[in-house]
């Protein structure tokens, strides 16, 4: 982690992956992140076998950029038990997920998904935030 006047910078590979149920997080900007902010939350999420299956969840409005997808897809819908829509994910796709829309990222056998997540706030960004 380096600083040049006010700008801070780091390579994502230098940030420890936080292994959570269903995904690994690389917390770049926000609460409990490499760069502290209460105004925004940005980082990477890794979906692969070692983290288990991602459960459907809902949270603050989010923008997602797909940085890697091997047999990956996203499902979304009206509640956790009714994810009626599914699309295959491709590198470079941008998803805008409205506030409180239920969704989950998945992959077929041998696959994985990596995303950049962007929130314009510091609260209600991860399922774990809602459990506290």
Question: Where in this protein do the model-derived segments appear?
Answer:
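A short beta-strand-loop-beta hairpin characteristic of the jelly-roll/cupin
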Residues: 63-91
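A generic "binding-loop/recognition-motif" signal
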Residues: 59-60, 70, 101-102, 111
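Short, small-residue-biased leader/transition segments that mark boundaries at the very start
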Residues: 1-3
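Double-stranded beta-helix
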Residues: 8-11, 18-22, 38, 78-83, ...
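Conserved metal-binding segment of the jelly-roll/cupin
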Residues: 89-108
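A short glycine-rich, His/Asp/Glu-containing loop-to-beta-strand
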Residues: 18-56
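Short histidine-centered beta-strand/loop micro-motifs
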Residues: 31-32, 52-58, 76, 85-87, ...
């Amino acid at each position: 982690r380096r600083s040049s006047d006010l700008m801070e910078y780091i390579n994502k590979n230098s940030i420890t992956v936080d292994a959570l149920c269903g995904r690994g997080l690389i917390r770049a900007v926000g609460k409990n992140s490499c760069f502290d902010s209460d105004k925004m939350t940005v980082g990477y999420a890794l979906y692969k076998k070692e983290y288990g299956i991602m459960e459907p969840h809902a949270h603050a409005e989010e923008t997602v950029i797909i940085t890697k997808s091997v047999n990956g897809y996203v499902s979304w819908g009206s509640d956790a038990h009714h994810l009626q829509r599914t699309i295959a994910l491709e590198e470079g796709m941008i998803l805008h997920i409205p506030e409180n829309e239920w969704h989950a990222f998945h992959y077929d056998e041998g696959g994985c998904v990596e995303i950049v997540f962007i929130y314009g706030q510091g609260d209600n960004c991860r399922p774990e935030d809602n459990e506290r």
